[in-house]
Amino acid sequence: MELDYNKVALKDLSLVWPEASKLIDKSLKHSQGQMNLDDILDMLSKDYLSLFIGYSKEGIDIAFTTQVIIYPTYKALRIIHLGTTDGLDYEAMEVIVDMIADSYDCKRIELYGRKGWEKALVDFNYYYAGTILMKDLKEI
């Protein structure tokens, strides 16, 4: 399935957010309480994060937030939150993400996610690059 995609402009955020937030909300179940939907909307409205959507005639099929990370030697597109409709073709998603990364002249895509993403994206040249360890010092 081929999807059209757009970066959501700040002026259009209120129009798209009700539908896109349902997909973004799926990713929050695995985010260790770092943010909620209100936090994400606030960060989007302040342009700290960017929201991209992929859509078909049925509606929004993928929604994800990103940041461009600038390292001394390269830029990376970091995917912060990503939610899809059930059964989305990962190849369609991959085409969108690659084009967005290329438009920012990024040399790498970073995606922190649950273990299932590693298996789902291995065919698209994603690889395991480390482990995130956490220690709660106070109740979150």
Task: State the predicted function of each range.
Residues 1-35:
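Short amphipathic alpha-helix that is part of the acyltransferase structural core
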Residues 31-49:
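Active-site rim helix/loop that mediates acceptor-substrate recognition in acyltransferases
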Residues 41-42, 67-69, 99:
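Short, flexible, glycine/charge-rich loop motifs used to bind or transfer phosphoryl groups or to couple energy/partner
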Residues 46-87:
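Conserved donor-binding loop and adjoining core beta-sheet/short helix segment
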Residues 60, 103-105, 127-129:
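Short glycine/proline-enriched coil/turn segments at helix->beta-strand junctions
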Residues 74-122:
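Acyl-donor binding region in acyl/amide transferases
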Residues 111-115, 119-140:
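Active-site/acyl-donor-binding loops of N-acyltransferases
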